[in-house]
Amino acid sequence: MRIRVFGAAIAALAMAAGAQAAFELPCKAGDRPCFIQAMRAHPARSAAFWKPSLSRPVTERLGPAPAELVEFLHLDNAANGFPEKPRASRLSADFMADVRGAIADLPPAVRRAFDATFAGVWFVDDLGGTGFTDMYSDASGNPVGGFIVLDAAVLGKFTANAWATWKENTPFKPAKAWKLEARIEGAATDDRRGAIRYILLHELGHVLSINRGVHPRWDIPPAEVPATARFPFFDLSWTIDRKGDRYASIFDAGFTAVRGGRFLKC
């Protein structure tokens, strides 16, 4: 499968975020193996692609998603059966001020995740969720860093508690008999900046897991996880069903209804 490689620099692409490209998917609808192969070969998964971004200060690794990254997200959504077609965001100055403020709010130990291997926080609309994290690899295919994508259209319309309430309600059908509300911030910080800060913390957890033995790589099938690999934190809650090529919760027997639902797409 040949994936087209773009030559434009990240900075130029970010400045031209208003011009949205039309992406032609390289695989037939529903052909997940084809999409997975295309994603693995995509420039956005390579360290070389992120080199221009990594050469800039961490505070400048923010902005509308470059075209290659948007294309990669189209592939990921198609591989997972999501209908959304992401497009680069047009970001207002006040929104970006909230993003920078949310990053500044993070504890120093967390901000250290924004290191030399962190390729930045990039924004799209119509992601199909609020946040997305993936890794990029060196020429030998070894993961060496990560990047985050956030949906600016979603974050732009919610305060922290409103976003959390919306997210917690997504697995359930509305009913007059009950109501679910979530509170993640006090009244003084229940704003858009608080929502951005919360989802950044979540996605940074994924970034921090790269190359740290927290859990198996998410870009390989469970059946292909090396049998000799050890993941002490992962083992507290999960096992690898190699025959079924899936991860199985050790709590499945006690919560049989959980396997019938889909509870989270960040």
Model-assigned labels for residue ranges:
Residues 2-10, 18-123, 215-220:
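N-terminal low-structure segments adjacent to metalloprotease catalytic domains
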Residues 93-175:
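Auxiliary, metal-adjacent structural segments of Zn-dependent hydrolase domains
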Residues 96-106, 193-205:
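Short, hydrophobic/amphipathic alpha-helical packing segments
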Residues 150, 198-214:
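Active-site recognition of the HExxH zinc-binding catalytic motif
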Residues 158-163, 209-218:
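Short, solvent-exposed secondary-structure capping/transition elements
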Residues 178-200:
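Short pre-active-site segment immediately N-terminal to the catalytic Zn-binding motif
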Residues 212-266:
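Post-HExxH zinc-binding segment in Zn-dependent metallohydrolases
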